[in-house]
């Protein structure tokens, strides 16, 4: 899974577009990130910037943004409606994919330390990056705002996590930055078949974590109950990590439950949806659809699609696009307007389409086009890419049998067994599909190295080193194809043994394809290893390939014995 995080810094400038533009330019110039949104506010005198990328790229871009803001914004001249403590007020890191919240918290702490060490801007760490329990709450870190810094920076209990221990001229100019880590927040509105804001609010109070005030007697008009400290006693709602209210939207002519899900691990979108549906039904209403505000991580929709498929007792081992369609239809994401994942899913939005098309040049072809490309006078794609594709087809056949078996009449009780096998097949197939283009890319690296200049001794040395590295890579890729194709056999064996008897021949063909993939890729390992100057590495790779080939031959024989016994 690709490692992606998001950063949403809030800069204390919302009116001077030249300053805002310079900060955004510094973020983009660092490279490797995509700016998704720039939202300046005149009244707040504050701009919220959203950008995403790899952890390393995002951290560097965040640092450059803080640096530029610290150069251009003078907090002594700043006034705005929003609480703030520095030129860069808050700087949260948010995991999107392939990263945990704790990993983001560690990055945030290191970033805060770097900001102070290199820029002399004091930093507090908040939320999951907090180094003191009370500082999990941003309000504690920002208490008194910028104006309180002279006092706070000399107070051992309130001084920044990274700072000099006293007020400085740099702090006077740039203030203090609050660096944190938090989970992704999903903003979502649930459409109701009513115009009543009061009823929408009732549902919101039923489900939101805060709940509703406890009352004496009548739950609507009764006197609010207070505790011994005079604080309102609340009846908690049913969803943790959720804030919600009800409102009426003139544009749509309906009421909605508007919700922020602040902890998507505790309460995923699909669980919140089902609970709002339950609460609405209990009050005689229906949820007619869902409106996602802003963007969501891909996993949010994948998890939702899988959840609704499992509720139907249907196999989840289907294509990612199909799982997303189930999520969209199940929650009515297209109720008010068309829902396009390419515009709403972060991972899709940041994907460079030209780069993706180049990376997937072969697998995006038609079957006919791929065959003609292979048959052309170009040396690539060759046996390595074809081996990977044969392996992918073997996995596809095993997955097909699993999916057919999962909803076979009379086998309803076994749907989960076959769904799990289909999931495994999809995983293996997707990795082998990626290897189709990777194998050709590895060959291209060899050709590029061969084409390097070789006039001087330095050029010869550089060319030799590049050629050795490219040849090693071109040997390791087909070895990866062998290892991955070997994973097809447990799937097709299980399907030959337990799957739909009418599809047993498909499981057999899957085994034949997987064996061909392994043995074909082995030939590529051997021919490329022959070009390695490092003979020890060459012998090691060839020996490993031989073991995998032997295992594949044996596994194929087992599957074919089962298949032939049933034909």
Where are these regions (language model features)?
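Conserved phosphate/anionic-ligand binding catalytic regions in large, soluble enzymes, centered on
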Residues: 7-9, 80, 85-92, 263, ...
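A structural-propensity feature for long, helix-poor, extended segments
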Residues: 407-453, 548-557
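Polytopic transmembrane helical bundles with strong interfacial aromatic enrichment
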Residues: 357-366, 372, 480, 487, ...
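Long, contiguous binding/interaction regions
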Residues: 1-365, 369, 376, 454, ...
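Amphipathic alpha-helical interface segments
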Residues: 184-186, 439-512, 516, 528
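Amphipathic, well-ordered alpha-helical segments in soluble domains
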Residues: 65, 370, 396-400, 435, ...
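Preference for long, well-ordered alpha-helical segments
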Residues: 111, 121-125, 134-137, 488, ...
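Amphipathic alpha-helix face/heptad-repeat signature
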Residues: 389-393, 421, 428-435, 474-484, ...
């Amino acid at each position: 899974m690709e490692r992606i995080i998001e950063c949403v810094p809030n800069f204390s400038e919302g009116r001077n577009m030249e300053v805002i533009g310079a900060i955004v330019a510094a973020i983009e110039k660092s490279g490797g990130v995509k700016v998704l949104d720039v939202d300046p506010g005149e009244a707040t005198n504050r701009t919220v910037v959203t950008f995403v990328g790899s952890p390393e790229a995002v951290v560097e871009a965040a640092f450059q943004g803080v640096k530029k803001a610290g150069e251009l914004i003078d907090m002594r001249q700043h006034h705005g409606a929003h609480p703030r403590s520095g030129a860069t007020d808050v700087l949260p890191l948010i995991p999107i994919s392939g990263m945990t919240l704790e990993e983001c918290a560690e990055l945030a702490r290191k970033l805060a330390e770097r900001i102070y060490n290199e820029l002399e801007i004091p930093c507090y760490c908040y939320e999951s990056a907090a180094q003191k329990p009370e500082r999990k709450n941003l309000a504690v870190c920002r208490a008194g705002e910028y104006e309180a810094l002279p006092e706070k920076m000399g107070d051992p209990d309130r001084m920044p996590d990274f700072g000099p221990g006293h007020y400085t001229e740099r702090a006077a100019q740039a203030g203090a930055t609050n660096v944190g880590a938090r989970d992704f927040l999903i903003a979502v509105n649930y459409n109701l078949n009513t115009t009543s804001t009061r009823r929408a609010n009732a549902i919101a109070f039923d489900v939101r974590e805060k709940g509703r005030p406890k009352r004496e007697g009548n739950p609507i008009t009764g006197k609010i109950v207070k505790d011994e400290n005079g604080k309102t006693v609340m009846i908690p709602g049913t969803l943790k990590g959720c804030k919600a209210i009800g409102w009426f939207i003139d544009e749509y002519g309906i009421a909605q439950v508007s919700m922020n899900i602040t902890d998507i691990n505790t309460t995923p979108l699909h669980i919140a949806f089902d609970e709002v549906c339950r609460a609405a039904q209990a009050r005689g209403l229906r949820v007619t659809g869902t409106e996602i505000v802003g963007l969501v991580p891909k996993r949010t929709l994948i998890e939702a699609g899988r959840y609704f498929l499992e509720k139907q007792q249907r196999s989840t081992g289907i294509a990612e696009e199909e799982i997303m369609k189930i999520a969209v239809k199940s929650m009515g994401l297209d109720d008010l307007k068309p829902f396009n994942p390419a515009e709403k899913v972060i991972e899709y939005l940041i994907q460079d389409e030209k780069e993706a098309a180049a990376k997937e040049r072969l697998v995006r072809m038609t079957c006919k086009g791929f065959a003609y490309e292979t048959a052309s006078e170009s040396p690539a794609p060759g046996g390595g890419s074809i081996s990977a594709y044969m392996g992918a087809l073997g996995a596809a056949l095993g997955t097909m049998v699993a999916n057919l078996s999962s909803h076979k009449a009379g086998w309803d009780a076994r749907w989960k067994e076959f769904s799990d096998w289909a999931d495994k097949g999809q995983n293996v197939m997707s990795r082998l599909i990626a290897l189709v283009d990777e194998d050709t890319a590895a060959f291209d690296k060899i050709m590029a190295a061969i084409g390097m200049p070789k006039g001087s001794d330095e050029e010869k040395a550089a060319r030799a080193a590049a050629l050795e590295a490219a040849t090693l890579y071109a040997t390791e890729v087909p070895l990866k194809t062998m290892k991955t194709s070997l994973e097809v056999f447990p799937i097709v064996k299980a399907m030959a043994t337990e799957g739909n008897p009418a599809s047993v021949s498909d499981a057999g063909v899957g085994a034949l394809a997987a064996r061909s993939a392994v043995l074909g890729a082995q030939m590529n390992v051997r021919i490329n290893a022959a070009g390695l100057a490092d003979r020890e590495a060459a012998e090691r790779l060839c020996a490993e390939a031989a073991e995998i080939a032997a295992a594949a031959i044996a596994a194929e024989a087992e599957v074919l014995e089962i298949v032939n016994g049933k034909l």
